[in-house]
Amino acid sequence: MKYYLYLFLLFTFANLLYSCPTYPLPIKIDQNDPLLLKAYNDIDLLIQSKMKADGVKSFVATIVYMDKVVFSKAYGKLNYLDINSPNLTLDHNFRISSVTKVFTSLMMFKLRDQGIINSLDDDIRDYFPKFKIKSIFKKKEEKFITFRQLASHQSGLSRETPCHRNEFGTSNCTEKIILAKLSKQFLISKPTTLSHYSNLGYSLLGRTLGESLRMKRMKEQEPYEYWVTNNIFKPLGMNNTTFNYEDIINNTAPGLVNNNGKYSIPSMTKSGWNSPGGGVFSTARDMGKLLIHLLGMNNNSLDIRSPSYLKESTLNELFSPSNLLNDGSASYGMPFLHSYSTNNSLWILSKNGDLQGYVSNIAFVKPYKLGLFFSSLTSVSSSDVYTNAAIDILIPVYKKLLEQAAIDSVINSTTTSSNSTTTTTTTTTTTTTTTNNTMESIFISKIPHSLLIGIYTNDYGNKFLILNQTTYGDYLNRLLVSYNGASLVLNKFELDNEYPYIKRISFYNESIPTCRTIASGSNDELIYFTFKDINGTIIDFNNNNNNQNIDINNLFVYSVQIMGSLLFK
């Protein structure tokens, strides 16, 4: 029987090697590790190689891990067409164009959290009644345009504001003119039914947010720009970031247009009413501060009343997808594009911008607390601006180092625990456990693993097997489990002290397409064991105020409830 179980579980758990992706816990690691230094050097060489191949003359790159800038570099000259030009630096300004939408989305969530707008699903005309547009749809709710629809490109609006770009910010493209033109136009689709990228939508979103402030408490001439400057730029120390080109004209690196090897500098157009969709000028250094903020790494140092403080739930919304695109491997969020990286089995969240010789991309790998901002100051066809290739270099290295750091932590904890423990009884067992696939410190469990090992069945043919502990890799010291042929690993429940009969199991043999539907890379369930004492009495841990005194030697596992089924040992 044991031989049969061994062969069965050997086959079942072989697919742990080809399982749903799991991600190590981001912790501080030595940035001078040779593997990291090589990775950063490889990224440096990658950028230089790509620049040469694509004819890019100036470029900036910033990479953040957790709360630190770990790589930053400027390439080329401030102005390639000026033979006397100084080198480009991390503090020179450039246009980030549609990356501006990140700030507009941040503003939306903050005003919602502050109660300035009641709900993301409010009709924007409740706040901006001057906005009108025609609709072929008859039902009242089909004519609504909400904050959420604008932020996720599902509003049904056209892509562009009804003005020529060269007229932005002039007397030919004022708010009055724009609203008058829109009032004679129609929605191109029913809101929420179609993903259709819209610069107009984000400009309207920012202006509606400004109107909500004007209604409630602010009387500034331009409440959108004023609010973003004073509630995002200034608190984050983004002192060289602005909507006003005149403020930084002498510090701005011009964008270049490459026309078959002939380079020219397009004239700098204003944004005017369209600023919320693409009007920000920033620097590589300032964008590094934004990366740290959006990774949630500076919240602990901020007062909860700070204008730049972000609730964890708000950050989760900001980074959540809203609607799947037709290709099935990408989706729009508010505002990030979510793209699945098959190379690394994870989602990359990004927002790019492309305007007048500037092509920028901000990207996040949330499970690893990595953020990147790359900007080409020359027109280039790469919409991700080489960030995806850089991520392909970074992830294997960070994964290896973080996994090793986790194992080292366990070994150190085990050594410390062994040195400090003078006696060992049969009522406690030292186990190394994982919650959400990240290593945690040693835990002294009330229920030893040996008590759980065995075969559980019921009259419906369900079979639940628990074998012994693993001794390798990510699954170190966890129990191997099989339920109806599916491979699992058993972890401790977070409240194991109070509820020692509850355990967490993780499924590991799912296909990659299935894995894509699972947030954070793991598919977990909770299971509930029932124990009897030597007299056949069921132990009720919930009603035992002193379950520390339960004699493990006289306990027997009676049953387990897993995914709605009750199985008996």
Swiss-Prot record:
The lineage of its organism: Eukaryota, Amoebozoa, Evosea, Eumycetozoa, Dictyostelia. InterPro entries: Beta-lactam-related (IPR001466), Beta-lactam/transpept-like (IPR012338), Beta-lactamase-like_AB/R (IPR051478). Residues 1-19 form the signal peptide. The keyword Protease does not apply. This is Beta-lactamase-like protein 4. The keyword Transcription regulation does not apply. Glycans are attached at N87, N172, N239, N240, N250, N299, N343, N412, N419, N436, N468, N509, N535. It is found in: Secreted. Belongs to the beta-lactamase family. Keywords: Glycoprotein, Secreted, Signal. Its main location: secreted. It holds the Pfam family Beta-lactamase. It comes from the Eukaryota. GO terms for cellular component: extracellular region.
